[in-house]
Amino acid sequence: MAERESEVVSTSGFKVRPLSKREPGAGSRESEISEGSTASLTTNPDKPKQSRLHELTNELRELEAKLRLGGGIERIEKQHKQGKLTARERIDLLLDKDSFSQEIGLLVAYDQYDGGAPAAGVVTTVGRVSGREVVVVANDATVKAGSWWPETIKKILRAQEIAMRSRIPIIYLVDSAGVNLPYQGGVFPGQYGAARIFYYNSIMRRYLKVPQISAVMGPCIAGGAYLPALSDVIIMVEGTSFMGLGGANLVKGATGQTIDNETLGGARAHNELSGVAHYRVKNDEEAIAKIREFVAELPRKYSGLRTGDSDSFSQSSVRSPQSSKRPPEDIYEIIPENHRQPYDMRALLDCILDDGHLDEFQAYYAKEIVTGHASIAGIQMGVIANARGMFRDPSGGAPRFGGIVYTESAEKVAYFIDTCNRHGTPLLFVQDVSGFMVGPEVEHSGIIRAGARFVEAMATAIVPKIVLTVNHASGAGYYAMAGQGFDPNFIFSWPTGRMGVMEGESAVQAVFGSELDRLKKNGQDPTPELEIEMRSVRETYERELDAKYAAARGFVDAVIAPEETRGALELALRVSVNYSGPHLGQFVVPASLT
């Protein structure tokens, strides 16, 4: 695995702002650090805003607006004519007004199926109902009647995992024709096929005590009927809902009996005859009101937030919330045009953290990685962030590349993670990492051992872990910085995020390097055929490094704009600390059962 980008350029100085408003003087940290001027990295009001992040954010918003239309205007109108709200209208009505919510997986499958599966036909959202954090899963009936693609299953499972890990209620708004039959091979079988949904339903119901509420607001057919049946509460809407293992046509074909769907499995049938459902309502609005009423009646569980008088290992302390030191719009100026160029990570954190305050841990050691304690909306957490640029080696060695993990920085972060884990402090990983350093010096310094220690500390920490990718997420450095394979509670990316084993030019060197060296030695240029092959590799990597590509495959929960970052991180923290037990893997079964 190639680890270091050879094209890291320029130098980056930095300074840490003091907690007080005093000017830096003799003996202050600012006067001690002289790794280049910070003037070029701070905001200049006369300087035009850099456009790369703006352009990518605008592209993202255009794509999101299109995807939120689901199957399109005509199908939305058809849904309304049937007396039904759309999936997103139902969610908007359900969630608390003026509260922040975060859709999970909006971009999933957007570039597949010839664009015919926007959001994979299901809307999954984290938000608040009656002041309580919840997860909502709503089938989008404007997209192939809400049927299930393979990616639909992945999104539902991801939503269930969020609910399980944090023990928060999950609400299903069911309006689905069941399996999308042409793609049943990716839906029905396998460890993570549709059956996994019902497995998670059962685990939540029996062992995790996660409230599950289902409102059947349209068809709910075949195996999909087990999803509401495994919930705590089932609400059905008169006239539009149907729940059954087989519809009227299947019944006629199998038994010869003629019956309509309403009589077979409508709201009245399941409330008056079978007893499968628990509530019957007249329309979608009444169903939503009933869900809100039920959530409000749920007993309040013990919160994972503390005010300082408790010593529980898995609680996060909370202080008075403050706004960020700098407005989020400044991020557009801080992130450079070229993703290889340096910038001031501490200036970026000023736009995210409460009052920009970072109580930096080992500030003078292994400066290529920033560690420290901070808070968002008053919730305290540990921050681990890759600094970019170049930094002097205090021992007189070669300058160090920011965004690269060295032996010392791996040891520094491992120690910091262990400390936060002992204190029950959630972790925020701000990723801009190009990999681990390579070469004889670092190999002989024991970087493999230090890197393994870094990975182990991160992987085994039982506190909530939240990831924000701002730029590079490459090589084994991505893994160590709580990559998706290590089950962080949430993983977000800015539009500038670039997730991949290496950059395109590095891939070209890895694949064609020997041939290029031979040609150069013989004084020859690459042939046209070789140029085409190399260009193809570059273009493939550039396409697959795009944050939207990662989001389309569920590698990140959401691509978010800079202005949404504090809201998304606050909600993620509040969701995560609902559960005061260990956060490890998809869920942890209570110790009393082991």
Where would I find each of the regions flagged by the language model?
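Ligand-binding clefts of soluble mixed alpha/beta catalytic domains
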Residues: A2-R22, E35-S314, R319-T594
